[in-house]
């Protein structure tokens, strides 16, 4: 080879060497470094691919929260530890949200839920049922003292002895209310019962007849009825007799066997010259029956307060004119006192002054406690024996009267 060509080749080789030195190492060292770079790049790509798979699994809650389900194209290549940690938190958040949803559904009475929630709910339901099963027995136990507080049939002997007086007083109050209960019903409105309404009008008609001392005839009573009510005359006459007993303490009796004429007779056996005479004869007789009965039930004396309380049950009030009895205060404190049927006096040592009523001498002479008790029992469709202590008192009075007559 010519000398000039060899020199040119050597110059080219030197230029190549100088050109390859800044580009990197040569030989086996360079190949080793290239292998390390390839391994590192493959491992980083594997981590990013796993992160992508995890992010795709957690995309559902992100979408529900309004987050975008997709990312940038080169996000996988530049994936870092912070991205992996964030994705781990996202994976935890769905489970947390599920647990929270369980509590919300259980509060909202959702019919479905996770198995654990169902088990816990079933336990709470069983506990609630147990409490409900206990509650009836508790309520029954609680009802026992309530029943024992009101009219318990049993008790200790000491309690019976100490409560005997209060029992007698309670019985007296019950008898008082019983004697006025049916009477109060007669003073109620009668618009819904035409027979009762006709009976009330018949009572007013007979009252006027009696005060004028005119005969009471069946023909006159039939004239007061319209044609459609004439077949009901026996029932109307029966109701009229009941009303007369309740209002005035008198009964309607036939004066002859033909049944064409009637008269009014006192149920208490009072004389016609007494309470059944003069003005307001029937109202006086009715109020007298009420006052004598109350005095008897209250232990042979009744305060003025007790009298007005009793009359109030019948719709009779102090200072108010009654449609049947008129001025009740005048009758019981003046008329009946003057006729000596009742005694109206001030209670001893009462301050402020308090007044009471007692039977008068004329009442003791013309009637008896037994008659009064029988009338009250008849009004209430009962028998005198249903009032044991009153019946015993009335029997004692009968015996004393018989002994006085023998003497």
Curated annotation (Swiss-Prot):
Classification lineage: Eukaryota, Metazoa, Chordata, Craniata, Vertebrata
Region Disordered, as annotated, extends over 1-185
Ranges of biased composition (kind: Basic residues): 1-16
UniProt gene name:
MAGEB6B
Q: The MAGE domain covers which part of the protein?
A: 195-394
Q: Which domain of life is it from?
A: Eukaryota
The Gene Ontology biological process annotation of the record reads: negative regulation of transcription by RNA polymerase II
Q: Where is the composition biased (Basic and acidic residues)?
A: 123-132
Name of this protein: Melanoma-associated antigen B6B
Question: Which Pfam families would you find in this protein's record?
Answer: MAGE, MAGE_N
Polar residues: which segments have biased composition?
A: 56-68, 94-109, 133-155
Question: Could you list the residue ranges forming a coiled coil in this record?
Answer: none
Q: Name one GO cellular component term.
A: nucleus
Which PANTHER family would you find in this protein's record? Answer: MELANOMA-ASSOCIATED ANTIGEN B6B, MELANOMA-ASSOCIATED ANTIGEN MAGE ANTIGEN
